[in-house]
């Protein structure tokens, strides 16, 4: 097909499918990270397209912190059963034994132990040499400077000053034993692109992205949804019921909702057309300290 005749979304789709197929052909043991969010749902859809009518030739991995929204876990299990892909779920056993949680230990320690260390454990356990992630360059400044093929050393760390050149659609996947590549097929997509593609392709998403009246508390400048009994009210707090939705999904105590009436995909797209901030402003882990996301990525975070 003539690239000049492709629409913007068709070009993005073709680029992403090309990257997914390249990794499947080039690496011995790839895996696709599955965080259950909108970007993961798009990436899963692209992987299914890339190998249709065959099955996805690599497993999907979810690093579970034990603090995800209940609706996310329900959606994860339902999706895995529906499409029949190989789903691996890993929880950091040491973190669970220590009782690590975001309320007692804070977002930074919780994220490091349950997410970063948990991810590195899983990658080492299964010996994956390439891992797909759904990060996009428009999300956050440290992600904006990361390559599509992001080299990681034997400790899974990232050095932004030691990245490989990428000329057009040519990628260097050469690694030594123990080294790996993080691969970001959605690098050139924007949040608006994601939502338009979800709408056009009729991709299923977690209902939390759609507005509904939900119980929340206002804490540290964020609207935190009361998802289970583990959220204890602090002095002066009270549960309110507001029309909210989420632009990004993570551990529920660390993910802020936005007040919104948008409960259909066209309404979400209308909101995105006038949005002036990144969806990651609702993630507490991005505000631990100046440059906190880049520091986390250097340590092995996605």
UniProtKB/Swiss-Prot annotation:
Pathway annotation: Sulfur metabolism; hydrogen sulfide biosynthesis; sulfite from sulfate: step 1/3
NCBIfam families named in the record: CysD, PRK05253.1, PRK12563.1
Coiled coil: none
Source species of the chain: Aliivibrio fischeri (strain ATCC 700601 / ES114)
Binding partners and assembly: Heterodimer composed of CysD, the smaller subunit, and CysN.
Protein name: Sulfate adenylyltransferase subunit 2
Biased composition (Basic and acidic residues): 280-302
Role noted for this protein: With CysN forms the ATP sulfurylase (ATPS) that catalyzes the adenylation of sulfate producing adenosine 5'-phosphosulfate (APS) and diphosphate, the first enzymatic step in sulfur assimilation pathway. APS synthesis involves the formation of a high-energy phosphoric-sulfuric acid anhydride bond driven by GTP hydrolysis by CysN coupled to ATP hydrolysis by CysD.
Gene: cysD
Reactions mediated catalytically: sulfate + ATP + H(+) = adenosine 5'-phosphosulfate + diphosphate
Entry keyword annotation includes Methyltransferase: no
MF terms in GO: ATP binding; sulfate adenylyltransferase (ATP) activity
Entry-linked InterPro entries: PAPS_reduct_dom (IPR002500), Rossmann-like_a/b/a_fold (IPR014729), SO4_adenylTrfase_ssu (IPR011784), Sulfate_adenylyltrnsfr_sub2 (IPR050128)
Disordered as annotated region, ranges: 279-302
């Amino acid at each position: 097909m003539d690239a000049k005749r492709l629409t913007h979304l068709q070009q993005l789709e073709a680029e992403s499918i090309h990257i997914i197929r390249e990794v499947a052909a080039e690496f011995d043991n790839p895996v696709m990270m599955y965080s259950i969010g909108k970007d993961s749902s798009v990436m899963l859809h692209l992987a299914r397209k890339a190998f249709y009518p065959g099955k996805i030739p690599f497993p999907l991995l979810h690093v579970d912190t034990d603090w995800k929204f209940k609706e996310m876990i329900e959606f994860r299990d339902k999706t895995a059963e529906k499409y029949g892909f190989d789903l691996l779920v890993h929880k950091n056993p040491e973190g669970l034994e220590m009782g690590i949680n975001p309320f007692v230990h804070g977002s930074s320690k919780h994220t490091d132990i349950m997410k970063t260390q948990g991810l590195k454990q899983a990658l080492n356990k299964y010996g994956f040499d390439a891992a797909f992630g759904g990060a996009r360059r428009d999300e956050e400044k440290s992600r904006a400077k990361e390559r599509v093929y992001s080299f990681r050393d034997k400790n899974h760390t990232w050095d932004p000053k030691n990245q490989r050149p990428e000329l057009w659609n040519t990628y260097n996947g050469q690694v030594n034993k123990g080294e790996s590549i993080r691969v970001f097929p959605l690098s050139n997509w924007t949040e608006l692109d994601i939502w338009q593609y979800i709408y056009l392709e009729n991709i299923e998403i977690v209902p939390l992205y759609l507005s509904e009246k939900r119980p929340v508390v206002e804490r540290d400048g964020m609207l935190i949804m009361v998802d289970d009994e583990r959220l204890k009210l602090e002095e002066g707090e009270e549960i309110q019921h507001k029309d909210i939705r989420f632009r990004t999904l993570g551990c529920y105590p660390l993910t802020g909702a936005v007040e919104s009436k948008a409960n259909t995909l066209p309404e979400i797209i209308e909101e995105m057309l006038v949005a002036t901030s990144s969806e990651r402003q609702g993630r507490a882990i991005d505000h631990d300290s100046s440059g906190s996301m880049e520091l986390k990525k250097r340590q092995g975070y996605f």
